[in-house]
Amino acid sequence: MRILFLNIFFIVSCSQDEIVTDKTFTIFEDQKILFDAGLINNDTEIIRTLGSGRVVLKKIELPETDNFHRAKAIITLKSTGDPWDKSGSFFLLPKANFDNLKEATSLELLRFITPFGVGHFNNKENIQKLKPSYIPRWEDDITWEEDISHLLPVLRDEVWVGLYIDTWSNQGWSVDVGFKFDEYYTKT
């Protein structure tokens, strides 16, 4: 019995540990969100555009999340000409397909407001005159990171994710969106 125990202990202790501290999952990269009433959707099976360009949806396959302990939603945006503050939302449509989106329940992951002066207006001379003296410069972009670890049970399999900005400008915004999963550990 002791020899069996020692053999099992030896086999288990010689197995390899795999520790991956994080995994970043890019959803949208340099995605344009703008208003264009005449927009003809050039939808693919993966990305769909709705609301005259103000909503984009993408079907993604999320990684297995059983071994992750934390998840974050990350959004980075900059203006490509829209001069106003706008509300926005990053959301998930679990267990949905494009044919039943109207009936699908959305799950908001991150709500945000686009800040004035980010990106497009950094080097505009007229805007610099309007900038408050206590702000040394406009930022190049803005990033939000939100802990969504409590949603790990639904962050799996094939889902639709969406991004909405309430813009009425045909210049709009450029957005990067992703997930970051932390603390992955397995013993092989």
Q: At which residue positions do the language-model features occur?
A:
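Extracellular/secretory-pathway and virion-surface proteins
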Residues: 16-188
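C-terminal motif of bacterial Sec signal peptides marking the signal peptidase cleavage site
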Residues: 11-13
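Sec-dependent signal peptide recognition
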Residues: 1-7
